[in-house]
Amino acid sequence: MGDWSALGKLLDKVQAYSTAGGKVWLSVLFIFRILLLGTAVESAWGDEQSAFRCNTQQPGCENVCYDKSFPISHVRFWVLQIIFVSVPTLLYLAHVFYVMRKEEKLNKKEEELKVAQTDGVNVDMHLKQIEIKKFKYGIEEHGKVKMRGGLLRTYIISILFKSIFEVAFLLIQWYIYGFSLSAVYTCKRDPCPHQVDCFLSRPTEKTIFIIFMLVVSLVSLALNIIELFYVFFKGVKDRVKGKSDPYHATSGALSPAKDCGSQKYAYFNGCSSPTAPLSPMSPPGYKLVTGDRNNSSCRNYNKQASEQNWANYSAEQNRMGQAGSTISNSHAQPFDFPDDNQNSKKLAAGHELQPLAIVDQRPSSRASSRASSRPRPDDLEI
């Protein structure tokens, strides 16, 4: 029974990827089945055939009667039961190793993409696809594997097959032996000359072990059923809470489109002002310096307000009768982006700009012209 160490090492790796019920099931399998089968049970059935005696001298009669009473030894039957029950768990472990291998490949690919990203290559979509694949395989940070998706289905299938094998071996044992051993077996089979009685060694001790292994099988079956219901209801609960696939919830949440035509967006997001229209009376080469915010996506920012301001300015210049050449260099100051509320108030008022000087354009009267032509005492003589 020294070969049990290899199976024990494999099953021990399943502990890290099992639920609480699965860990208890593995403990029951190790302690009450493998260890007990490798120590006490094997020694109890060690003299099984050698101590089987029949009240006849006919050669070969004891062998055929033993074969009829015990088609398969209890020890070998329980070994087969442990192997069959452990196979679904080993298949689940193989799936876990497959997922871990996938994780290594995805991590390697992710590192290569991050190196390419540092060189200026746009790999955001590829990195997003890798994250989705990791979630699909149940891979979390720090190499931890979470039970979801295909891994969860494999785990549920393994529990189902373990339960089926437990029930099948219990039925086979009941059909072949029953759950107790008799001290005397009656045999009538060739080449026995007549019906003979055969005697079994330590029947009570063997019956105790049979009942004990029966109880362990029932406990294992109950743990499988409990774990199956636990995994099922936990999956339903996660789906109700929306935790089963958070990528579906976040993938549809697209960022809102930016309205570059909005005045508030242009002001608060650094949109550059359009080039303001020059006044009709502006001299050649005159240019109004505007604020540059390094963003050409919002060139229609505050266009109507700029045109209205320049129209008001031109009307004031025409009314005042001033030439465009009198524009001082003080107009070439950086264009300010006022607040929307202040800008609207100025547009509503329409008379924010005041004339620099008031000139009376009416013609002078005759009296005033004559009075102005008379010499005054304080006039300077040339």
UniProtKB/Swiss-Prot annotation:
Membrane topology: Multi-pass membrane protein
InterPro entries tied to this protein: Alpha_helix_dom_sf, Connexin, Connexin43, Connexin43_C, Connexin_C, Connexin_CCC, Connexin_CS, Connexin_N
GO BP annotations listed: atrial cardiac muscle cell action potential; bone development; bone remodeling; cardiac conduction system development; cell communication by electrical coupling; cell communication by electrical coupling involved in cardiac conduction; cell-cell signaling; cellular response to amyloid-beta
Compartments where found: Cell membrane; Cell junction, Gap junction; Endoplasmic reticulum
Composition bias type Polar residues, residue spans: 317-332
Molecular-function GO term, any one: beta-catenin binding
In-chain residues carrying the UniProt-annotated modification Phosphoserine: 5, 255, 262, 306, 314, 325, 328, 330, 344, 365, 368-369, 373
Keyword Phosphoprotein: yes
Signal peptide segment: none
Any one GO cellular component localisation term in the record: focal adhesion
Region (Interaction with UBQLN4): 264-382
Positions where Phosphothreonine occurs in the chain: 275, 326
Cytoplasmic topological segments: 2-23, 98-155, 229-382
Region (Disordered): 317-382
Extracellular side: 45-76, 177-207
Sorted UniProt keywords: Acetylation, Cataract, Cell junction, Cell membrane, Disease variant, Disulfide bond, Endoplasmic reticulum, Gap junction, Hypotrichosis, Isopeptide bond, Membrane, Palmoplantar keratoderma, Phosphoprotein, S-nitrosylation, Transmembrane, Transmembrane helix, Ubl conjugation
Compositionally skewed regions (Low complexity) per UniProt: 362-374
Effect noted on mutating residue 290 to N: In congenital heart malformations
Alphabetized SMART domains for the sequence: CNX (SM00037), Connexin_CCC (SM01089)
Pathology noted in the entry: Oculodentodigital dysplasia: A disease characterized by a typical facial appearance and variable involvement of the eyes, dentition, and fingers. Characteristic facial features include a narrow, pinched nose with hypoplastic alae nasi, prominent columella and thin anteverted nares together with a narrow nasal bridge, and prominent epicanthic folds giving the impression of hypertelorism. The teeth are usually small and carious. Typical eye findings include microphthalmia and microcornea. Oculodentodigital dysplasia, autosomal recessive: A disease characterized by a typical facial appearance and variable involvement of the eyes, dentition, and fingers. Characteristic facial features include a narrow, pinched nose with hypoplastic alae nasi, prominent columella and thin anteverted nares together with a narrow nasal bridge, and prominent epicanthic folds giving the impression of hypertelorism. The teeth are usually small and carious. Typical eye findings include microphthalmia and microcornea.
Protein name: Gap junction alpha-1 protein
Upper lineage: Eukaryota, Metazoa, Chordata, Craniata, Vertebrata
Gene (UniProt): GJA1
